[in-house]
Amino acid sequence: MPEVSEMVWNDFFSHFSLNADGSRSYDGVQVKRNAVFADTKGHWAQNAIENTVAEGLFSGVTDTSFAPNTSATRGMLMTVLARYAGTDTTGGATWYEKGMEWAKTNGVSDGTNPNADITREQLVTMLYRYAGSPTANGKLDNFSDSASVSSYAENAMQWAVANGIVNGSNGKLNPQNNATRAEVAAILMRFCEMSK
């Protein structure tokens, strides 16, 4: 059985599938759920990275590197959420095509700019839509940059704060900042725990 860390990121999305029993496969071979990346040891998000990789939601950019501080893309999140929903994301003209189709069909994203870096507020908004756009009752005024949250993302950010999905950093939400792969892993892990 290959380990998740043995899969190369660029090829991963075109070969990955979710089995009916919840296990993951790579080219039809069940994936062993452990990964060790040289660049995540001691990283603040190491646990979240290991958990999301173990769940088959993420893979490394190489067999030994996760690139935790690299920006995530919109297509990446669409694909990860499609996979989390149990959708087979293999095939398609691009690695993100099946995830993008799923995101558009399910109202999670309009499918635009899949290769663009995803901002923190875009990330939270996609998660919020995935969750069914529940009532938002969190307060953002404890964060010094709350006024920089775009109007389209306000309810999503309030919901994410209220549910502990987003905690901010140094009293800021940084909604306009690009989300790193580590931040996506951490936010996604909290979202998955909340969704159980």
Language model segments and positions:
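Extracellular, surface-exposed repeat/solenoid domains
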Residues: 1-3
